[in-house]
Regions:
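Class I (Rossmann-like) S-adenosyl-L-methionine-dependent methyltransferase catalytic domain
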Residues: 1-96, 113-117, 121, 131-195
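Conserved acidic residues
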Residues: 99
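A conserved beta-strand element that flanks and buttresses the S-adenosyl-L-methionine
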Residues: 102
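Short catalytic micro-motifs in class I SAM-dependent methyltransferases
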Residues: 105-109
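Helix-to-beta-strand junctions that scaffold the AdoMet/dcAdoMet cofactor pocket
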Residues: 110-111, 126-127
Length: 195
């Protein structure tokens, strides 16, 4: 994650959490959780303000957060009541394995090379048959937005590169959706993998 991206989230953490915590993620939750065992362990990668962590915890899952923004880590932990690790995604080295990863609108802040590196190294921390959900913006250009946040767009080519690094994984669900915060020109591709 670039310094300007991290600076944005640290400097706008409260505002960002308040805005994103009101998004209706019910369809995404439903599609994801049908693949996760009841009470299973989930890591929310890029947990932001803690919206998804809180939902998972409130529905009986063992939820843990991960975020690179120190300010968002504090907010997410307080809001959700879940443990949150503050770490760069690529530096994260947990001491156990998990049933599922949830990376909603977070990996897109990495370069394509680092996204592929994340998949090739961090899926080792999923239990056998583990589930990996991720979503990324479509139809955008790679680079910084007006706020200095770096984005990598979703593409079919990127997905194929991810799959090539994980030859035994399978796509179990995939869908295209409009923005949950009603931003008119923003669309998302969501993918669920069984690793």
């Amino acid at each position: 994650m670039t310094n300007t991206t991290l600076d944005y989230y640290n400097n706008h953490a409260q505002e960002y959490a308040q805005t994103t915590n009101r998004a209706d993620m019910s369809e995404n939750y439903s599609r994801f959780l049908k693949f996760v065992k009841e009470g299973g362990s989930i890591v929310d990668i890029g947990c932001g303000g803690g919206r998804d962590l809180k939902y998972f915890k409130d529905h009986g899952y063992e939820a843990t957060g991960l975020d690179a923004s120190k300010e968002l880590c504090v907010i997410a932990s307080k809001y959700s009541g879940c443990p949150v690790t503050c770490s760069d995604f690529l530096s994260w080295e947990p001491n156990c394995k998990f049933d599922a990863f949830w990376a909603n609108a977070s990996l897109l802040h990495l370069t394509e090379k680092d996204i592929i590196r994340f998949f090739s190294t961090k899926t080792a921390f999923l239990n056998n048959g583990g589930i990996f959900y991720f979503s990324m913006k479509t139809g955008i250009q790679e680079g910084n937005d007006d706020n200095g946040r770096f984005f990598t767009p979703f593409s079919e080519a990127l997905l194929q590169k991810i799959l090539k690094t994980l030859p035994s994984c399978k796509i179990v669900d995939r869908w295209y959706s409009s923005d949950r915060l009603d931003r008119k020109d923003t669309h998302w591709e969501s993918v669920i993998l069984r690793v």
